[in-house]
Every structure is written in structure tokens, then in C-alpha cells.
């Protein structure tokens, strides 16, 4: 696919134009009032609690749009849904039906009762928590590893291991379009306006397509190595990418320039999540902590200690609560104890 190349992101300091580092990048002079306020909050709410969810490692966690439920997808071929009751997660149901690992899941953007799972069994399944049943199974051409729901709720995009992205009508459950890419496709996402579709790829690029036309708009050389994950901030101002170079880069949605880099992790960045107000960014990797940064300055706001690599993080859509899931613990005796747990950070220390 011939897409015009933009200039390099984090390593192109001083350049301007789409895809470059903004020249106004500056180092913060001290903690902002927001950072100090959130640090004060987390000093009293720094507890992390574990909740049994699955019989094998958890690949994906996501909150419903109203924040009442958390869903998790696992290597054990199931999805679990929890209700958030005050300061704990109560398991509501386990969803069976997939014949292989559930690699990613997401909720409908505005209907808190529907979520969709992507599996290595070459299907996606749409589930309704009201009936606890699968309302649709859609067969796809390959083993599915990435999935997202369009902001208008009308389309589900699913990416497979063969770098094919299929666009599925959320009402008819039929394929509307299919794109085969000539590069390794990692995470996929619409922008908040629903008129562009973003892909991160194995060459360190962000590929941007118009939507629904799926015509190439731009390719940004975002990182010198594999660009793994992408998330849009709920305010629509920024998006962030995480890379195998251990950097998180923050991009201006309108200008497509890199405005900031976060470099406290040492391992490839696997997962990202913006807080509900767009002011905090959580990023995680094989490092044994989750970095929580203030978006506007890049300053470290907090770090959540982990005992193993983190696969997935998700901020609650209304509260400063962070759900996450880690790899199984190392060691013969510890590994089975933590396999399949979902964790929640931000709980009161005395809870």
C-alpha cells in the first residue's frame, strides 16, 4: 500500500509538520496542582486488590461505558463480567463458547449491556449481559487478535494474525469491508470523530485511513521499532502510542505532531489507557510497575507496583480506578495462585 511518509516522531526534535515532534515541547518546572491533588488522593487510595476471574492468564480488560461492569478475556477461552460494587468487583457471569483464547474484547461505546470478544477460533462473538447469552457469532478468515467498536456503535473492526482487518456491521453482523495489509498490523482504533481509522504497525508507523472510504491519508514514522498499541483520549485532543522501544508518545489529534514522550519504562509498551478526564495516562510493559503520568506535562504522577509483566490496563470511565491484569507469577508454586486474576488499583487503603 503506497502511503506518503511523514517525518519521524520522537526522534525528530525541532522539525515541524505532520508526524514530527512539536518544537514547543518543554520540560515541566514542577508538579502541577492536578498532580499534587491526585498524588494526595492516591496516598489514601493506593490499595490494589485481586479478584479471581479465569483459570489462565487474562489478556484483556475493559469497562462498560457506564462504569458498572468490567469484562475480562482470557487464554482459558472465556470472558468474565464483574459488577463494580463500591470498592470491589463481584463476578456476575462467565461467558463460554469460544474454541480458543479470547485475545481482546471491548464494549459498545454507548450501550452498557453489549460487549464483543475476538478469539483465535476465527470468530468474534457479541454478548448481552442482560440475557448472559451470545447474540451473534461472526465467522472471520483468520485468528483474531485485535478488536474495536466504532464511536457511533455501527461497526466492529477486527484484526487477525494475517494482517487482515474486517469491518462488521454491528446490526446485521455481516462484513462491510475487508482490508489486507502488507505490514504487521498491531492495534487498531477509530478516532473519536469516527471519520478516520488508525493502525499501528510492525515498522513503527501509524497508518491513518479515511473512514468509511478506507483510503490512505497518512503514514507517520512514530517509532524506530514495532509500534504496539494506540489509544485516543476521551476529550479528543490527543492519542498515544506505545512501542517496542519502551517509549510512549503523545500526539496532537489535529496537527498529527508528537507533543511529548514518556520514557520511564524499560521494556516494550504493551498497553495504554487514558483516564476519564483525559488528564492521566497509564502505560505498562514487562516492567514490574504501571506508570501513571500527567498527560499535559509528562510528569510521573504515580506508579502501581506489580509482581509480573502487565498485559492490559483500563481506567474506569468515571472514577480514578485502574483495572489491570498481569502475567502469571514466576516460580513453580506462585504461578497457579495468580493465574487468571483481575486487579483493581485506586481503592481506599482502609478498605
From Swiss-Prot:
<comment type="subunit">
    <text>Component of the THO subcomplex, which is composed of THOC1, THOC2, THOC3, THOC5, THOC6 and THOC7. The THO subcomplex interacts with DDX39B to form the THO-DDX39B complex which multimerizes into a 28-subunit tetrameric assembly. Component of the transcription/export (TREX) complex at least composed of ALYREF/THOC4, DDX39B, SARNP/CIP29, CHTOP and the THO subcomplex; in the complex interacts with THOC2. TREX seems to have a dynamic structure involving ATP-dependent remodeling.</text>
</comment>
<feature type="modified residue" description="N-acetylalanine">
    <location>
        <position position="2"/>
    </location>
</feature>
<feature type="repeat" description="WD 4">
    <location>
        <begin position="180"/>
        <end position="221"/>
    </location>
</feature>
<keyword id="KW-0853">WD repeat</keyword>
<keyword id="KW-0813">Transport</keyword>
<feature type="repeat" description="WD 5">
    <location>
        <begin position="222"/>
        <end position="261"/>
    </location>
</feature>
<dbReference type="GO" id="GO:0000445">
    <property type="term" value="C:THO complex part of transcription export complex"/>
</dbReference>
<feature type="compositionally biased region" description="Low complexity">
    <location>
        <begin position="7"/>
        <end position="21"/>
    </location>
</feature>
<feature type="repeat" description="WD 6">
    <location>
        <begin position="264"/>
        <end position="303"/>
    </location>
</feature>
<dbReference type="GO" id="GO:0000781">
    <property type="term" value="C:chromosome, telomeric region"/>
</dbReference>
<dbReference type="GO" id="GO:0003723">
    <property type="term" value="F:RNA binding"/>
</dbReference>
<dbReference type="InterPro" id="IPR015943">
    <property type="entry name" value="WD40/YVTN_repeat-like_dom_sf"/>
</dbReference>
<dbReference type="InterPro" id="IPR001680">
    <property type="entry name" value="WD40_rpt"/>
</dbReference>
<keyword id="KW-0509">mRNA transport</keyword>
<dbReference type="Pfam" id="PF25174">
    <property type="entry name" value="Beta-prop_THOC3"/>
</dbReference>
<keyword id="KW-0677">Repeat</keyword>
<dbReference type="InterPro" id="IPR036322">
    <property type="entry name" value="WD40_repeat_dom_sf"/>
</dbReference>
<keyword id="KW-0007">Acetylation</keyword>
<dbReference type="GO" id="GO:0006397">
    <property type="term" value="P:mRNA processing"/>
</dbReference>
<dbReference type="GO" id="GO:0016607">
    <property type="term" value="C:nuclear speck"/>
</dbReference>
<keyword id="KW-0694">RNA-binding</keyword>
<dbReference type="InterPro" id="IPR020472">
    <property type="entry name" value="G-protein_beta_WD-40_rep"/>
</dbReference>
<keyword id="KW-0508">mRNA splicing</keyword>
<feature type="repeat" description="WD 1">
    <location>
        <begin position="53"/>
        <end position="94"/>
    </location>
</feature>
<feature type="region of interest" description="Disordered">
    <location>
        <begin position="1"/>
        <end position="22"/>
    </location>
</feature>
<feature type="repeat" description="WD 2">
    <location>
        <begin position="97"/>
        <end position="137"/>
    </location>
</feature>
<feature type="repeat" description="WD 3">
    <location>
        <begin position="139"/>
        <end position="178"/>
    </location>
</feature>
<dbReference type="GO" id="GO:0006406">
    <property type="term" value="P:mRNA export from nucleus"/>
</dbReference>
<keyword id="KW-0539">Nucleus</keyword>
<protein>
    <recommendedName>
        <fullName>THO complex subunit 3</fullName>
    </recommendedName>
</protein>
<comment type="function">
    <text>Component of the THO subcomplex of the TREX complex which is thought to couple mRNA transcription, processing and nuclear export, and which specifically associates with spliced mRNA and not with unspliced pre-mRNA. Required for efficient export of polyadenylated RNA and spliced mRNA. The THOC1-THOC2-THOC3 core complex alone is sufficient to bind export factor NXF1-NXT1 and promote ATPase activity of DDX39B.</text>
</comment>
<dbReference type="GO" id="GO:0008380">
    <property type="term" value="P:RNA splicing"/>
</dbReference>
<dbReference type="InterPro" id="IPR040132">
    <property type="entry name" value="Tex1/THOC3"/>
</dbReference>
<keyword id="KW-0507">mRNA processing</keyword>
<comment type="similarity">
    <text>Belongs to the THOC3 family.</text>
</comment>
Amino acid at each position: 500500500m503506497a502511503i506518503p511518509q511523514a517525518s519521524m516522531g520522537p526522534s525528530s526534535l525541532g522539525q515541524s509538520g505532520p508526524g514530527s515532534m512539536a518544537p514547543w515541547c518543554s520540560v515541566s518546572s514542577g508538579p502541577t496542582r492536578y498532580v499534587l491533588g491526585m498524588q494526595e488522593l492516591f496516598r489514601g487510595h493506593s490499595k490494589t486488590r485481586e479478584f479471581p476471574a479465569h483459570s489462565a492468564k487474562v489478556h484483556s480488560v475493559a469497562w462498560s461505558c457506564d462504569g458498572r461492569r468490567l469484562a475480562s478475556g482470557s487464554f482459558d477461552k472465556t470472558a468474565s463480567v464483574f459488577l463494580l460494587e463500591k470498592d470491589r468487583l463481584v463476578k456476575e457471569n462467565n461467558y463460554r463458547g469460544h474454541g480458543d483464547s479470547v485475545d481482546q474484547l471491548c464494549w459498545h461505546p454507548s450501550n452498557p449491556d453489549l460487549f464483543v470478544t475476538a478469539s483465535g477460533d476465527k470468530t468474534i462473538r457479541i454478548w448481552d449481559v442482560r440475557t448472559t447469552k451470545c447474540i451473534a457469532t461472526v465467522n472471520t478468515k483468520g485468528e483474531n487478535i485485535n478488536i474495536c467498536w466504532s464511536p457511533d456503535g455501527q461497526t466492529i473492526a477486527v484484526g487477525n494474525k494475517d494482517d487482515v482487518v474486517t469491518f462488521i456491521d454491528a446490526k446485521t453482523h455481516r462484513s462491510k469491508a475487508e482490508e489486507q495489509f502488507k505490514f504487521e498490523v498491531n492495534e487498531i482504533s477509530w478516532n473519536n470523530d469516527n471519520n478516520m481509522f488508525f493502525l499501528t504497525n510492525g515498522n513503527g508507523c501509524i497508518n491513518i485511513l479515511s473512514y468509511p472510504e478506507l483510503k490512505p491519508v497518512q503514514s507517520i514514522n512514530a517509532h524506530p521499532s514495532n509500534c504496539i498499541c494506540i489509544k485516543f483520549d476521551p476529550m479528543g485532543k490527543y492519542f498515544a502510542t506505545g512501542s517496542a522501544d519502551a517509549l510512549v508518545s503523545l500526539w496532537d489529534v489535529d496537527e498529527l505532531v508528537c507533543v511529548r514522550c514518556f520514557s520511564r519504562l524499560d521494556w516494550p509498551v504493551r498497553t495504554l489507557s487514558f483516564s476519564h478526564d483525559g488528564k492521566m495516562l497509564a502505560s505498562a510493559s514487562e516492567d514490574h510497575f504501571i506508570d501513571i503520568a500527567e498527560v499535559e506535562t509528562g510528569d510521573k504522577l504515580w506508579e502501581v507496583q506489580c509482581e509480573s509483566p502487565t498485559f492490559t490496563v483500563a481506567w474506569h470511565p468515571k472514577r480514578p480506578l485502574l483495572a489491570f491484569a498481569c502475567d502469571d507469577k514466576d516460580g513453580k508454586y506462585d504461578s497457579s495462585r495468580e493465574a487468571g486474576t483481575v486487579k483493581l488499583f485506586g481503592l481506599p487503603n482502609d478498605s
